[in-house]
């Protein structure tokens, strides 16, 4: 787009060369140019912050405003052709001061201020707009809202005129200024009206012209309808005035340029003379014309947005509220700066967030290395970048947006921080558990000399130190969430829970080792007691030394052995548990579980001994000890004269008394079951469901079991007792019959006549042997050999050797016969037929010859492996 003979720069994507002559801020159609910010960036004004100044020029059309600016600031605004009298500047144009490049050799004290922006405003009273003064009013309001200095370009001969001296325009400026001040009642921003009197001849002193203009301005101000509260205000409350005169450009060109050069030195920072200050703080200006109070306090990087917002309010005929516009600008720019700061923050923090999220999703939170420094640096840089750019804007908005930015940053950093502590928490607890377990195993290998409580305390201290170190390395200074005491407290509680669980597990393992020890001791002791049944009569099971145990007190002895063994186990358990730093409640629960488990071991052992096969075997052994041996333990040799029936009846009845005795666990001393319920005790109040889930219910102890103590102590039911009694009697009857047969067998004798007959018939053979020395000697040698063989118990081996030799001879004969038959066809056919028939017969015979399974013997009991940890038991 081309305007005023130059590129307006309103089209998107303009090249930087398009901005060499400035940029059209507002075109003749009242449209704001969105590329103003690009122009400021091109001129390197954006980073200047508050170090810039904005000047606007007013005046009638075709009065040389653009010419003045071009000569004064080195700009390239379009000027009117000398051959035509028409509008040249359309809308509002903006350009940066270029005079600095032309004045490098000037005095540094008199050089112009940096970053001076000049706005060339469309002239007033032009024929193109005619009586349409809407744009004049809007452009005046826009210039007043944005500019520090308003240059009024008038001719000397127009001073004293109303229209010619732009008094109508100035009245508009004053009116809109009052509107602005009415909205902004918290401050009173001032502006400088700089009157540049063109074609100044010097005939009328400049001071007189100045007085005339000030009189006209005061008169206009007095005629204004002022809002409430400003009735007594004066023009000097809001404006400062400066005046300068310039010779005719065409008639006095050299002098014109000299005066322009002098005028340019006034466009620099100045200050008020402290000696001339009045009660309102105003006074004469020294140095340059740019005072801090003129500046609108809009940072350079936000000027384009601010100007666009102001113009939007003006062009839409809305009340222009500069404080609101400044706040809106501050919000807009602070949001932009915040987003830019968050971009750099994202680049630094997003990789850590991604890693943490992946680790959490995988179920294995990971402690991220270098997270703390990255968080601190990212937060510091983001806040610093925001402060650098945003601190120039509205203070309240800046502080609010800074707080919002910090909230966003801290929300993400807090999530990372908590995630890091969560990962450190989980890994720390896991490492603590593994370290304790490893130390316990190492102690067990050294001979069970480890102190579990000391191991836990040491590893717990190391775990807490590591957690605190990780937490401190992740802290972010000045962050409200940067405190890990709550997480540390949770971590310590979790370590306590883990320690308690490890202690309970270790006590469970200790209880298991003690139970194995109890099982081993009870197994041996109970075996000895049941094996001693019947030894009271001095049979084969009688002890070699000491008193012979009574069968009636077997349960008393078993109970005493059981109680003593468990008491010893409890003592060992308590001593070892004290090294675990276990509480009294935990020890009570452990002892209670040990007693219940031990009773289960004893009951299982008794049930094993009371199995039908084992019990019948014990009854038979008991009966045979009483029947086959006398009271002195000497085996009986039955004779026909012995009273076998009486001995049999006594032994059988004595053995039958064992069945009811063994059927019920009852103490002979009290004739009642042992006090199992009192011995085990009540369930400890600290016991948990987990402590009871693996325990076998005990009748008379557990109310919900539904069995009484009497039923718990019943080992053999009535039906089983009757069956065992019948079967035992049959076994005893068999022993009795065998004894009876052996006694009767000794009564049979050879008749006497048989010896006479044998002597008569064998007389010739007797004489032959006696008369022949060889036969006699052979008979004598055979007799001696037979005697020696008998004395040496060699008849058995000789008979076996003979049988083996005969068997081998028979097998060898069969083999040779088979080879002979296989050599002929007839023999092979006969063998095949014989084999088929024999297979059938063997199958039938195998079914008939199957032996029934032997009655259940004593169950093999495998020796239980005892761990190295059981050595102390």
Swiss-Prot record:
GO annotation, cellular component aspect: endoplasmic reticulum membrane
Chief localization: endoplasmic reticulum
Segments of this protein annotated with the region Disordered: 1-20, 677-703, 828-873
CDD domains with a match to the protein in the record: GBP (cd01851)
Record bears the keyword Kinase: no
Coiled-coil regions, chain positions: 482-506
InterPro entries given in the database record: G_GB1_RHD3_dom (IPR030386), P-loop_NTPase (IPR027417), RHD3/Sey1 (IPR008803), Sey1/RHD3-like_3HB (IPR046758)
Compartments in which it is found: Endoplasmic reticulum membrane
Signal peptide, first to last residue: none
The entry's keywords: Coiled coil, Endoplasmic reticulum, GTP-binding, Hydrolase, Membrane, Nucleotide-binding, Transmembrane, Transmembrane helix
Record-listed GTP binding positions: 59-66
GO biological process, one term: endoplasmic reticulum membrane fusion
Membrane topology according to the record: Multi-pass membrane protein
Enzyme Commission number(s): 3.6.5.-
Biased composition (Acidic residues): 690-703, 864-873
Cytoplasmic side: 1-749, 795-873
Residues that span the membrane, as ranges: 750-770, 774-794
Keyword set includes Transferase: no
Lumenal-side positions: 771-773
Molecular function GO terms recorded: GTP binding; GTPase activity
Pfam families: RHD3_GTPase (PF05879), Sey1_3HB (PF20428)
Role noted for this protein: Cooperates with the reticulon proteins and tubule-shaping DP1 family proteins to generate and maintain the structure of the tubular endoplasmic reticulum network. Has GTPase activity, which is required for its function in ER organization.
Family that this chain belongs to: Belongs to the TRAFAC class dynamin-like GTPase superfamily. GB1/RHD3 GTPase family. RHD3 subfamily.
Name the record gives this protein: Protein SEY1
Species this protein is from: Ajellomyces capsulatus (strain NAm1 / WU24)
